[in-house]
């Protein structure tokens, strides 16, 4: 180890040596730098390997024309509801039929509105807005599509005919269009063989709330009910499904069944106490004797079965012992015979 002298006191006078302190030298770590890097090793040049593979670069030719892609145009169409389309189709078909038939005269318009009226004072405003002779006018019912359809069917049915039957008509009970009935207070009874569905449709269209409170209409409602046997037969010829549905509706329309609440259990003992023991059914002495006899027979049968099983097991054991004894005797006889020879 190398020792270095370090002055202790620099402020001493001349001709006096300072005290000497011996201490080990400090170990400094070498620092790598550009100057002293050659001291630690030789520098070797970095070699880059050559490219051995070949690369073919494919560049696009200038002759080729670039065609930009066109985006397809999306057409969005709002679909109309089915109900609106059906209503439009029906309106168009009705207009075509009306155009084919031609314009109706005032008399025809009055005749088409005639099945809904009972006297000369009633007219319908939905088909003929101009009032005729009278004071009562029925309002148009265009709120629901069903009522409109029923009205159109009723009008088309009466427009196909040529007249309205009445009891006071001059020729054959038929009046020409445009002429009012002289005494239209009460309609005659229905002719046998004729269906009453247009009158029923008119009543359904008008409803109970829209019918005016007049005695004439009440008489019409009473006369419209079929009373003749022929009319009853025609009404019975309708499909039975409607009657079945009506009967079901009538049954369901009644008040709902109310279940009676079950009464609470009435305990004969208090909550803290236990219930009394169950009582056994009283049997007659004869029944008791019969039951005891059947029990004895069952026990005897079980005992006999056990005895039989024991006997069988014993017999099988005895048979096995006998077979063993016989085999031993045979072996002894064979040995004695072989010894004698």
Curated annotation (Swiss-Prot):
Compositionally biased region (Basic and acidic residues): 78-89
Name of the protein described by the UniProt record: Putative UPF0607 protein ENSP00000381514
Compositionally biased tracts (Basic residues): 243-252
Source superkingdom: Eukaryota
Polar residues composition bias: residue spans: 108-127
Protein family per UniProt: Belongs to the UPF0607 family.
Species assigned in the record: Homo sapiens
PANTHER family xref list: POM121-LIKE (PTHR15566), UPF0607 PROTEIN ENSP00000332738-RELATED (PTHR15566:SF7)
Region (Disordered): 78-131, 216-282
One Pfam short name: POM121
């Amino acid at each position: 180890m190398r020792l270095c002298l370090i002055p202790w006191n620099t402020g001493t006078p001349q001709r006096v040596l300072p005290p000497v302190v011996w201490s080990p030298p400090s170990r400094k770590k070498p620092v790598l730098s550009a100057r002293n890097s050659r001291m630690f090793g030789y520098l070797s040049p970095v070699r880059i390997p050559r490219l051995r593979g070949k690369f073919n670069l494919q560049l696009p030719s200038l002759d080729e024309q670039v065609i930009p892609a066109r985006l397809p145009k999306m057409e969005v169409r709002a679909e109309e509801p089915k109900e609106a389309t059906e209503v439009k189709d029906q309106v168009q078909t009705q207009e075509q039929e009306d155009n084919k038939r031609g314009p109706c005269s005032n008399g025809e318009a009055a005749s088409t509105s005639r099945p809904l009226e009972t006297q000369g004072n009633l007219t319908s405003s939905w088909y003929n807005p101009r009032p005729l002779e009278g004071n009562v006018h029925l309002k148009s019912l265009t709120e629901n599509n069903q009522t409109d359809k029923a009205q159109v069917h009723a009008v088309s049915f009466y427009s196909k005919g040529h007249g309205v039957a009445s009891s006071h008509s001059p020729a054959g009970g038929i009046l020409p269009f445009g002429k009012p009935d002289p005494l239209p207070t009460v309609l005659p009874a229905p002719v046998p063989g004729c269906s009453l569905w247009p009158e029923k449709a008119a009543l359904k269209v008008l409803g109970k709330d829209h019918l005016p409170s007049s005695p004439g209409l009440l008489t019409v409602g009473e006369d419209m009910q079929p009373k003749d046997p022929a009319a009853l037969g025609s009404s019975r010829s309708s499909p039975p499904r409607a009657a079945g549905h009506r009967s079901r509706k009538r049954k369901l329309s009644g008040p709902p069944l109310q279940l009676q609440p079950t009464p609470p259990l009435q305990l004969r003992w208090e909550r803290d106490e236990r219930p009394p023991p169950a009582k056994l059914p009283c049997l007659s002495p004869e029944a008791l004797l019969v039951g005891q006899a059947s029990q004895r027979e069952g026990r005897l049968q079980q005992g006999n079965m056990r005895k039989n099983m024991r006997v069988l097991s014993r017999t099988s054991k005895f048979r096995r012992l006998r077979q063993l004894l016989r085999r031993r005797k045979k072996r002894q006889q064979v040995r004695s015979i072989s010894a004698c020879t």
